[in-house]
Amino acid sequence: MSAKNAAMSPTYPMVWQNKDMALNLKDTFHSEYSVIKLLAALKDIEFHKKRAESKSLKKIEFNDTKANTLDISRQIDFEIPAAAQKMVSNPISLNENWIFRSQDLIEIQLSIPNIQTSISAQMYFETENLGSLIRVESIVQSKIFLMSSFAEEFVSKYWKKALLEDFEILNQWLKSIQISD
């Protein structure tokens, strides 16, 4: 992988800890872009539409009427394991609440009612000499961990993969708008 393509690659693998029926995940990304450009892109509905294209999207709605807050409601089709199909069916509903707390912190609350799961994530931004460092700390809580491993599988297939994909899409999107500016 060239340095150009690795601009937003994780610096270490995600850390999984199972504690009190919650999974704690930590990841770090580097970006060639400034914190200001990253935050502006993450507030932009067009970016979120672009990131939604990569998922099996059925429906998406936005609400950005509150200052420094973006609510996104989505429905996606997800590959549901046979063991969980009695409890869960498609489409899966995802409700995201992005709160832009400051120039160095975004809080994201993601609820997935179909599988009684919620994700609380914090994105911390730091300026570096050649861009930015983004630390993502997430806590995944589910009421159905005991009934099925589906919630863990969902997190493994959706949340971890979505973070990596979203940062790649963010990098590409910023490059494309930079060219058109």
Regions found by a protein language model. Give the residues of each.
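Low-acidity, Ser/Thr- and Arg-rich intrinsically disordered low-complexity segments
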Residues: 2-4, 9
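Beta-strand/loop substructures that line and gate deep hydrophobic ligand-binding cavities in soluble
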Residues: 109-157
